[in-house]
């Protein structure tokens, strides 16, 4: 029985127009994914709803019957005409493909085919038109060589941050088609953090224990809100990147509150409420410097969201090939996520040095305990990444004597 592998390889490096209706549906799907992923991952989480959406849409392009219906239902597309979503994606690719000086954002898709395996020309054409996919012929019988070839493509598209993604064991004689998605983002903060202000601070993990972590500090004028709902108090902060096309939203529960209780509040409507009610003000910010690399198997997650048919031997993928025994065996995503102080020296607005004694009039946003985050593409209102930080990786503060802190 032939198999299809879906790989969504994502790299997010924080250095320094779909319609509104479509954005709303994408946000709802992103929240659904987060709620399911959080059930099986109790510590740090990082994943890309955009990446999962893309690989599912690549399958839907060739899916028929129940397989197509399940994908459309899970992606909240019941109220749109079949096929409309692909033209929305085409517009999205057009919106993000323009090169900008303020940031680097690369979104690449590739389709690897077994030599001699017949794939319908219409499907190949659709992948090029809607997903800008590169199409490559390989021999999966030589699993090791294929793994090296695809891993090299991933490494190149992610600027070398994700290496040796595949091993020969992941491909076999039944492998016929591998869909790969890679995302790379590198952006400078619109208002940067000064490295000399970073200090070692205790971070309280979810289990109550503490760990010393580098804490970035700045006094910035940015969007901020304090919310109180269902006996839960929490803060929401939005940090913009240069160019204002991307921003990072951080949700911080009040100290001592269970982050899982705040997670239960998250809905698409709630996110829209935060965005509309936050006000721009001066905020004293303390944010961990950290990096996380995570690989997530989404097969069980998608099963829980009622996408089951594509994983069965009898699914109808006749829009891809006439072979009657083709199915999806894996949906896996890997993300590299890093956030630090770096910003452009040419930035027009810079974080203010924080003295030892702060004015009590300032709002304080001190992320020294678990928090949630969302990265969005502002022009399309699309959620690119979502995650949770419960235990930041400890890093050295270069060029400073830590014993003196």
Curated annotation (Swiss-Prot):
GO cellular component annotations of the record: extracellular exosome; extracellular space
InterPro entries membership: Serpin_CS, Serpin_dom, Serpin_fam, Serpin_sf, Serpin_sf_1, Serpin_sf_2
Tissue expression per record: Expressed in pancreas and adipose tissues.
Tree of life domain: Eukaryota
UniProt keyword annotation of Secreted present: yes
One GO MF term attached to the UniProt entry: serine-type endopeptidase inhibitor activity
Family, similarity comment: Belongs to the serpin family.
Protein name per UniProt: Serpin I2
């Amino acid at each position: 029985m032939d198999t299809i592998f879906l790989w969504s390889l994502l790299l997010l490096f924080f250095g320094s127009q779909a319609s509104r209706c479509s954005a709303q549906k994408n946000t709802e799907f992103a929240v659904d994914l987060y709620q399911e992923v959080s059930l099986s991952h109790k510590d740090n989480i990082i994943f890309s709803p955009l990446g999962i959406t893309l690989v599912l849409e690549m399958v839907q392009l060739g899916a028929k019957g129940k397989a197509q219906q399940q994908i459309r239902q899970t992606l909240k597309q019941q109220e749109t005409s079949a096929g409309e979503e692909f033209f929305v994606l085409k517009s999205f690719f057009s919106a993000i493909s323009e090169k900008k000086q303020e940031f680097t954002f690369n979104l690449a898709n590739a389709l690897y085919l077994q030599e001699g395996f017949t794939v319908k020309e219409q499907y190949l054409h659709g992948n090029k038109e809607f997903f800008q996919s590169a199409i490559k012929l390989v021999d999966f019988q030589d699993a090791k060589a294929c793994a090296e070839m695809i891993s090299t493509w991933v490494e190149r598209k992610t600027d070398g941050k994700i290496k040796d993604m595949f091993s020969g064991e992941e491909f076999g004689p039944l492998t016929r088609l591998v869909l790969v998605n890679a995302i790379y983002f590198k952006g400078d903060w619109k208002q940067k953090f000064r490295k000399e202000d970073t200090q070692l601070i205790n971070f309280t993990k979810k289990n109550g224990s503490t760990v010393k972590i580098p804490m970035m500090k700045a006094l910035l004028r940015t969007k901020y809100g304090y919310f109180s709902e269902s006996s839960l108090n929490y803060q929401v902060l939005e940090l913009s990147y240069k160019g204002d096309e991307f921003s990072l939203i951080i949700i911080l529960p009040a100290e001592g509150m269970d982050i899982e209780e705040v997670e239960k509040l998250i809905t698409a409507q709630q996110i829209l409420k935060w965005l509309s009610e936050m006000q721009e003000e001066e905020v004293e910010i303390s944010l961990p410097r950290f990096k996380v690399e995570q690989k997530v198997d989404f097969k069980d997650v998608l099963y829980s969201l009622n996408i089951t048919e594509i994983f069965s031997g009898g699914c109808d993928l006749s829009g891809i090939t006439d072979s009657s025994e083709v199915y999806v065996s894996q949906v896996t995503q890997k993300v590299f996520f890093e956030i630090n102080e770096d910003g452009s020296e040419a930035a027009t607005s810079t974080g203010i040095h924080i003295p030892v004694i702060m004015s009590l009039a300032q709002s304080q946003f001190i992320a020294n305990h678990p928090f949630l985050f969302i990265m969005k593409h502002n022009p399309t209102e699309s959620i690119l990444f979502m995650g949770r930080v419960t235990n930041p990786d400890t890093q050295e503060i270069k060029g400073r004597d830590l014993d003196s802190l």
